[in-house]
Amino acid sequence: MSRDPKLSLSKFLECLNEIEHEFLRDKVEHRPVLVRKLQELQQKTPKHVAKLPHEPEMIQQIHQAAHRIDIVAQAFIRFDQKFVSLCSEIVHDTTKVMQEANVVSPGEGCRNLSEDLPAYHMRNHFLHTLENPYPTQEEKEGLVRLTNESTARIRPSNAIRPPLEVHQLTLWFINARRRSGWSHILKKFAREDPSRMKRLVRAKLSSSNQSTPPSLTSEKPSDDLDVVLSDNLGRPLTLADKQQFEDDWASMISWIKYGVKEKVGDWVYDLCAASKKTPKPGMPRPVTTVAKRHPARKTKPAAKPKSRTANPRASTTPSIDSTLDSSKLESTPELSMCSTADTSFSTFGSSLSMSHYNPFQDGNDILQSPTVKARGNRKVKALPKRAGKQQPDEVDNGKIPFLCLSVAFV
């Protein structure tokens, strides 16, 4: 076309159709060629338009071809613009999702936090918001969703475990602030002032060459840690204060990264789940009642009543005759009136004679021991005397009031 100095309507239409077909083929390497052809055609057309014959039909076809090229060119321009816009949106959305999920590089993740922990996302959020670990409602919902998704993805065998809820996450953050020591640092080294705690966290992160949260990068540089500590304490900083703060800070970071309770492996949960007996099909589900939940108090069994049967009572008075066997002795009701408590001669009256006291044939035996030889070689031990009224006839006859009244022999 450039070689032909003379331009006709037919050639002009042919050039437009060629450019249109090349546009539709959409080859990247042809785009500079198409641009150059359009530029040459634009330069030559004004010079020859006035000299061209008036052919309405040919002119109409040229207009239609030019309109189609314009539509195709605008469509490609929009495609390119939309492609750039979509790429930008994808990059922005991906960055936002990664920030919400707090995804870090594999090396840093292995050093800082284990993704296998059930509370990984909550701990990571706590670690990135140390100056104010109070998530908003929107952040809580996002953390709950991420935790449930990651738990279902990492441990599909534990799908029976109920999903995390927002109120459980709220309780976790309340306990985390207290158990990690964050509340202790806020109270002791920041006077329970959130603004002072914010300055303290920024100063500590800057002094330890740790990355600060994104929300703090736009603010003024953090102060020196010693200056902030001295200002928060309201007195000159001592080595003991500095060491105490460093110990509390290290303990807090260690708890956030590696919770003691969550260091337990999945096998513990599997073991606990396996230990629970599954009910057999068709068996009724046991209902836990108050009586079953709290077993009845164990009561001491009632003591059996002691037998009131009177044991045979023998005299506790030591026997003078130790050679005699006392294991075969018995007491009888007839001997209840006899007394062996006092067998000495001191009880006798001075006016009485021993010749009047001879109730037994063997007087020497009865004086030596309260044991009496009964019929059939049965030995009977006398019981202590029971006091009784003295009979006047006995006194008159010269008998002793302390004598045994009756002795029965079996």
From Swiss-Prot:
Annotated region (Highly conserved between B alleles) at 111-410
The feature table lists the DNA-binding region at 107-184
- Subcellular location, principal: nucleus
Positions of the UniProt region annotated as Not essential for B3 function:
333-410
Task: Please give the residue ranges the record annotates as the region Variable domain between B alleles.
Answer: 1-110
Question: What's a single GO CC term here?
Answer: nucleus
Spell out the residue ranges making up region: Disordered. Answer: 203-224, 278-335
Record motif Nuclear localization signal, residues: 276-308
Q: Of which family is this protein a member?
A: Belongs to the TALE/M-ATYP homeobox family.
Function, as annotated, reads: The B locus has at least 25 alleles, and any combination of two different B alleles yields a multimeric regulatory protein, that activates genes responsible for the pathogenicity and for the sexual development of the fungus within the corn plant.
Q: What is this protein called?
A: Mating-type locus allele B3 protein
Where does this protein come from, organism-wise?
A: Mycosarcoma maydis (Corn smut fungus)
What is the taxonomic lineage of the source species? Eukaryota, Fungi, Dikarya, Basidiomycota, Ustilaginomycotina
